[in-house]
UniProtKB/Swiss-Prot annotation:
Negatively regulates long-term potentiation and modulates adult synaptic plasticity. InterPro entries: Pants/Emi1-like (IPR021475). It is found in: Synapse; Synaptic cleft. Residues 67-81 have a biased composition (Basic and acidic residues). GO terms for biological process: negative regulation of long-term synaptic potentiation; regulation of synaptic plasticity. This is Synaptic plasticity regulator PANTS. Keywords: Secreted, Synapse. The lineage of its organism: Eukaryota, Metazoa, Chordata, Craniata, Vertebrata. GO terms for cellular component: synapse; synaptic cleft. It comes from the Eukaryota. It holds the Pfam family PANTS-like.
Length: 108
């Protein structure tokens, strides 16, 4: 079991966690998040992941490994959850084959 632990690698290198943390804390990203979502970004998870990655590289801590795995699973699950912008159609509109009235104004 100890041999399999030594071969495990974090899903991302520690440099990537560090660059994600720097990006999250950047002024440009903070402005974008505030403009888009109305709140400042929460960079705590990137910081914790970076610290866990460094801890794994130094000590091969099982707690750091489990924390990184759980964080990545949560991150992937959050990416899969989204609200579709458009309502998906089950069938095409009934008048899809008719020509468009480009010269005439449409009724409101």
């Amino acid at each position: 079991m100890a041999g399999s632990q030594a071969q495990w690698r974090p899903p991302r290198s520690c440099d990537i966690y560090c660059s994600e943390l720097k990006h999250c804390k950047s002024l440009r990203n903070r402005f974008h998040e505030y403009y888009t979502y109305g709140r400042a970004p929460d960079c705590q998870q990137w910081k914790q992941d970076y610290q866990n990655c460094k801890d794994w590289e130094k000590n091969h801590s099982t707690q750091a490994k489990d924390s990184l795995q759980e964080s990545e699973r949560k991150r992937l699950a959050d990416q899969r959850k989204f609200t579709p912008v458009w309502e998906l159609r089950q069938k095409p509109p009934s008048d899809w084959h008719l020509p468009l009235n480009q010269g005439e104004p449409q009724d409101p």
